[in-house]
């Protein structure tokens, strides 16, 4: 049996959420610190997108919906000029914390 075979899908989901949440959080904290947004928005959006896909695989519908809303907020900031304030970033970070707890 391969090492990967010893893990359940939930174990893999948990690991994916953990690694992607690091990228998501780093991106949002960089935005909050006033760093140029383009790369950080893209990184955080990709992380939310990856979590959405992982949640879909384990059929965690609430996780899919939450990650989708997070992704939409970041795409809005990228493409439509939505400005993420400190309060908005805090909400996204709280949503990320919730996804971590769901995993």
For the regions a protein language model found, what residue spans apply to each?
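N-terminal assembly/transducer modules of large multi-domain enzymes
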Residues: 1-103
